[in-house]
Amino acid sequence: MLILRGAPALSAFRHGKLLEQLSQKVPAVTGLYAEFAHFADVDGELTADQQQVLGRLLKYGPSVPVQEPTGRLFLVVPRLGTISPWASKASDIAHNCGLQSIQRLERGIAYYVAGTLSDADAELIAAELHDRMTQRVLGQLEQAADLFSHAQPKPMTSVDILAGGRDALAKANIDLGLALAEDEIDYLVNAFQGLKRNPNDIELMMFAQANSEHCRHKIFNASWDIDGQAQEKSLFGMIKNTYQMHNEGVLSAYKDNASVIVGNVAGRFFPNPETRQYGAVQEPVHILMKVETHNHPTAIAPFSGASTGSGGEIRDEGATGRGAKPKAGLTGFTVSNLRIPGFEQPWEQAYGKPERIVDALDIMIEGPLGGAAFNNEFGRPALTGYFRTFEQAINTPHGEEVRGYHKPIMLAGGMGNIREDHVQKGEITVGAKLIVLGGPAMLIGLGGGAASSVATGASSADLDFASVQRENPEMERRCQEVIDRCWQLGDENPIAFIHDVGAGGISNAFPELVNDGGRGGRFELRNVPNDEPGMAPHEIWSNESQERYVLAVSAVDFERFKAICERERCPFAVVGEATEEQHLTVSDSHFGNTPVDMPLDVLLGKPPRMHRSVTREAELGDDFDPSELDLDSAVQRVLNHPAVASKSFLITIGDRTITGLVARDQMVGPWQVPVADCAVTATSFDVYTGEAMAMGERTPLALLDAPASGRMAIGETLTNLAASRIEKLSDIKLSANWMSAAGHPGEDARLYDTVKAVGMELCPELGITIPVGKDSMSMKTKWSDEGVEKSVTSPMSLIITGFAPVTDIRKTLTPQLRMDKGETDLILIDLGRGKNRMGASILAQTYGKIAAQAPDVDDAEDLKAFFAVIQGLNADGHLLAYHDRSDGGLVTTVLEMAFAGHCGLDLQLDPLTDSKGEVPAILFNEELGAVIQVRQDATPDVLAQFSAAGLGEECVAVIGKPVNNAEVTISLNGEVLFDDDRRMLQRQWAETSYQIQRLRDNADCADQEFDLLLEEDNPGLSVKLGFDVNDDIAAPYIKKGVRPQVAILREQGVNGQVEMAAAFDRAGFAAIDVHMSDILAGRVDFEAFKGLVACGGFSYGDVLGAGEGWAKSALFNARARDAFQAFFERTDSFALGVCNGCQMMSNLHELIPGTEYWPHFVRNRSEQFEARVAMVEVQKSNSIFLQGMAGSRMPIAIAHGEGHAEFASEEALLEADVSGCVALRYVDNHGKVTEAYPANPNGSPRGITGLTSRDGRVTIMMPHPERVFRAVQNSWRPDEWQEDAALMRMFRNARVWVN
């Protein structure tokens, strides 16, 4: 084993944070130093040249001064006996660089901790420094040799029920954490006594996962009686009623990994499978919809819990029908009180929590980062979501109870697209190959399905921890590329059947696959790719290692499928074959036995149906009279409540522009304020149709009136979706996520009554279907605190997500008040018709109350009329701004509109009341409704349209107007009741987000961004162009019909190739899909290409540095090096590197003439992934892409974690600047070059973010022009832009240059 020291592992900021954390736990700690340590398992000796290559491979990341380490060593390495995802990618890179004798590379972090430390101190320190699920702490570097030795496989065990009977199985149930119900134990004893043999542990584990509440939804399929009355329908039966009543537009419901609804027709853009040239195929582009929860894992390990939650939902979409494409994501979180240190709120009481779960603040620091990181690396934009905190002591008939979310809700959802012919699964032929696609098995996530089906605290802490999976999004991206290549084959798609691997691992996925296809299966356990050879059979079969799919591929299609996987470098294995008989056999060649041998109907047949016998409880509530409240204090409390406050800290960490198909993200207007009501994507690059999604939830309401909370969730979803241009209400389809503390007094009945209200009443009345959903029935946390039994129980929680096809994405409304449209009015539409019910409002919660009367949807007809009128007004161009009313009430609605519009407000409440005592209820009630901005001359017509639809004076009123200063006033009868400065109110609203950002990221950056809100004259984003945006300078060349070829180059983990191809295609190029594996295998060189474009993403998951592994596999592979060098030396060639491609090309500068002063790109100064819209200014340079654009300023999409330009020296920086190599700089909203955050999102010196070679043929940049070449792709754009955006000129310049 070779040991190679690496660079320091912590930036100054991270070092300070960790040192503070350690010294809080162990005061004896006085110092800390950390560096990477690399270990190479080598077969034989490396030559001097090979040692040099290895040395260069392992030099990556920022240049930080190396220290000589002192102090006690804590060497954190991957868990012994496993192969880490880092190792498999780094080893791949080494092999691609010709280092075949390296069997494996591994990496650890060597922490040297100074201070006089006892063994007990060392244990505490070790616990802080590693994740015990996937890592080990060693005391010496040499001990890392154990990483390369493998344990012997463990044998299976059986449970002796033939001799020990039922008791033997009952004991195994506890030991193995199976969570079997009493009647299931009886069922299994009878089944195996019938088979005349003892069950093996692998069979029991498989049965427990497949039949867990998590997988089987027993409560939703149960029979019920309530208060002694038998109920007619199951919960699921009532949900399905919505489909029976209204199934138009639904193509697949209740039977696949996601639901499918009818989409629009468009030119679906992808590479031709034969020629590899990108082009558009006109066809129906149907919409997938899915929303999952990952609550249990997120409570235990928030980053990985939320990350694998998003990953699992993405796989559900990809595994729909015969393969589909995920498109846009959403994330939601509900947790208990945050209690941010130094920013505790008056309503946040400390109640404690069990040791095994993480507190709410840490969940909200780590969980969102996990969800965002997976989406970012996979390449899916995260476009909407919600965040709520709730934890309150409530008086009940049984005494005081704490209600809240110690077991959090972590919601991961999204939408995708699928071809019409692939919506239904195909046929599994007898003898079809049963394949696992994706990553290897590892001992992680064992028993997750069963673990998430019990109340937190009812199983052992070790089993809880073992049930959390770990993530590798770059692997999932490779799998998706394989699925994409398959569906792009159309009729020749080799995938007959596909499922994702989730709860229960392949022990659940393979039986489900063959059973759904009407077949059985014969499997060989040792064919399962396995990075942990010491596992026992049940661990190999049931672990929940992520990023895996199971597929059936017929023998005739297998070779084609195999070739696709090899090109994409995606691991796969044939584990079995389909049989005629519906029997499951798993053999084990290592031990020469058959661990599983059972009829499928024993596993998946009809275990006993659950029956629920429950009683209703009185609804809860308390007295809350807001009439005397001080408005200033009430507004401040409400604006600080996390459900109301800015969600910026959740949003800027998530890429919102990847795919180039995003038409509406969360950030609104020139000041990019996070207040959008819905998310909208374009169907494709050639149309204005699209898809919209939005959410609704009012979970605390369920304590007062559970059915009302369900109706309000649906109502809020619809008032959010009303902002997009949807043909008719019934085009909207809903996903319902149900959470309940089943078994807690009154909760089962509340659940039943809510499902009934939604499924049997409101949805049928609205003409809306719920074709998909998910349930989580163990929303309770129990623990013992110094002998006191404690529990926190969630309210019944229904979270609704709505999806719909959109007729015109240009017509999406936002809350931004327009000050450039003359005199305007603000009109309130109050669907509560003046009832002003305050139940469970944010205002009540901030005073420790929940009030008594719940807002509700009193009449479905009002909701239908509202939706129809808003759509009509939008179509006619009457609406300048729109925002729905929800958390925080009317005052929040109008303030958010003012924040987005950078203006003040003059509100007159006279049309709503003449009593000052009613004002707080008017301002803070959360009845359904919206506020719209219209031109004053249109106001009479708008009011008349509402009145004609049955929404007259008791629900629609003019309540004031925006004003062109920063003053916000609220008046009644001429008396000013509230008067404040918009900037100060916006800082109050932004402070919760700022406080979390300060704890999580570089505090200096957080401070800079927060202080920007005080700037009086911030003009926001703007455009200043030195050219005509509508002038297509490439048109004369396109007319000639000659399309020069450009190589759209990608490496494993790259995810931005399609939009890049679309931009070049539009400019008149033939865009050709080229994978690095094509270059390394000699299938492609660059001779035929005029252009070479390296695209954005996460090549090799950024292992060995961002873009560096990709670059080094080009530099140190002889064939690849020759191809790149020959291309760059041609004078008729051009190249572009964007984001990850920019990082990659900056590391190739030794091959690119005239680039000796280029920097390389390292971690952002904020220490965070930054996804924003930034202003850039084009510099005077020779770049062929930027000719005629010098001096132009425009917004551009940025999304990267490592975009800080690090030059070799001060001299190199100066030289780059004076030699004309700098092509693009960040500027602030005033047009000044800046290093200040967030205008310069990575802190690059002198604002440098784009460079070119001396002759201008090769240009690199961190921002993403390929995501914003159409006007509709921009989060904000000037009104006068039509189809093209400013940055389309870049691509057309390249086309002009070629001729």
Curated annotation (Swiss-Prot):
Family annotation (SUPFAM superfamilies): Class I glutamine amidotransferase-like (SSF52317), FGAM synthase PurL, linker domain (SSF109736), PurM C-terminal domain-like (SSF56042), PurM N-terminal domain-like (SSF55326), PurS-like (SSF82697)
Keyword field contains Nucleotide-binding: yes
Keyword set includes ATP-binding: yes
Catalysed reaction, written as an equation: N(2)-formyl-N(1)-(5-phospho-beta-D-ribosyl)glycinamide + L-glutamine + ATP + H2O = 2-formamido-N(1)-(5-O-phospho-beta-D-ribosyl)acetamidine + L-glutamate + ADP + phosphate + H(+)
Gene Ontology molecular function terms on file: ATP binding; metal ion binding; phosphoribosylformylglycinamidine synthase activity
Membrane spanning stretches: none
Gene3D superfamilies: 3.40.50.880, Phosphoribosylformylglycinamidine synthase, linker domain, PurM-like C-terminal domain, PurM-like, N-terminal domain
Top EC class of this enzyme: ligase
Binding site for Mg(2+): 677, 716, 720, 884
Annotated keywords: ATP-binding, Cytoplasm, Glutamine amidotransferase, Ligase, Magnesium, Metal-binding, Nucleotide-binding, Purine biosynthesis
Region: Disordered, residue numbers: 301-327
Pathway(s) it belongs to: Purine metabolism; IMP biosynthesis via de novo pathway; 5-amino-1-(5-phospho-D-ribosyl)imidazole from N(2)-formyl-N(1)-(5-phospho-D-ribosyl)glycinamide: step 1/2
Positions of the Glutamine amidotransferase type-1 domain: 1046-1299
Location of the active site: 1139, 1264, 1266
Subcellular location field: Cytoplasm
A Pfam family that the UniProt record links to this protein: GATase_5
Enzyme Commission identifier(s): 6.3.5.3
Residues holding ATP: 305-316, 384-386, 676, 886
A GO cellular component entry from the record: cytoplasm
SUBUNIT field: Monomer.
Family: In the N-terminal section; belongs to the FGAMS family.
Function of the molecule: Phosphoribosylformylglycinamidine synthase involved in the purines biosynthetic pathway. Catalyzes the ATP-dependent conversion of formylglycinamide ribonucleotide (FGAR) and glutamine to yield formylglycinamidine ribonucleotide (FGAM) and glutamate.
Protein name, as recorded: Phosphoribosylformylglycinamidine synthase
